[in-house]
Amino acid sequence: MKALLIALALAAPAAELRIEKVFGPETPTGRYKHPASITGLKNGDLMLVYYGGEGEYAVDTGVFGAKWSRATGKWGAPRMIAHDPFRSVGNGVVWQAPDGVVWLFYVVRWGSTWSTSRIQGKVSRDGGETWSDSFVVSDKEGMMVRGQPLALDTGEHLLPVYHETGYDTEMVGPDTTSRFLRYDPRKKEMEWRESGVIRSRKGNLQPAVVQLSPKHLVAYCRRGGGYGPAKDGYIVRAESHDGGWTWSEGADAAFPNPNSAVDLLKLRSGSVLLVYNDSMSERTPLTAALSTDGTKSWPHKRNIAEGKNSFAYPFVIQTADGKIHLVFTSDSRTAVNHAVFDEEWVRGAPSGASPPAR
């Protein structure tokens, strides 16, 4: 797979952006490939998952996982790790917890629309090689998952989820809310408890959350409403000051949002990285913004990918070497892309960015 060198900061050779198309329509997991997620494993490898099949609402969908080997520098072939013989599956989130357990959270749709979904899970104790049977994370109708969990200072795990209502596939209603589930791995029982709701004027979903201090959390969420051209579409921002138990009313942030997923990550330096579509109507460009003051201001911004395409569902992590790894989908939801850059690249002077190599 050919990596495309997109930009090079003149000041430092390390400050570059590389994007490769990991899987395309030719990959035999079905033409459709959407919301990808990624995690760093204890041995230095990476693992990504996505759900694929013949279409978003097809009954043949499954969650597929693939690994990047640090030893070879290559991605292995994807294999199915979650499937339901009677129902469609959706968004998958993979995450290695601090104790080494790899979690897979994914959506199972019980009816014809996503508002009939529940959340199921699996765990792996050998780095994603083998997986447990599936179990219920939330059996509440309309609950879905998209964002990566957060390991809190308390030792608990906080899982961002959302509750979608209604049966209109072209509209996200105002009663759709971002929510959180909380789990304490020190307890014997495996129970994810509800922990806070974010409400907003247009509705919101797919929260991405960071912990700025032991009690202070900030979430950026995809807006509700329609998918057509908009003049009033912004990322929804909310805060918690009690460790994620309660949340402020969601308010419009300074960033546009075309009813598309965003991701938020606190870097090792303490800076906060936001990846989003810098448009109210289109899922292009895909942009990175950097805050050095706890999301109060965002002085640095660079496009990761731009052009006539749809660059959607960013999911971003930082590995122990400081590198930032981003996965996103493109090409009418038929391609999964992997971008690698660092904080210095985001701080660099803006320059034109190009779509992934085809």
Can you say where each PLM-predicted feature lies in the sequence?
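Asp-box/BNR beta-propeller blade signature and adjacent active/binding-site loops
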Residues: 14-358
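Sec-dependent N-terminal signal peptides
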Residues: 2-12
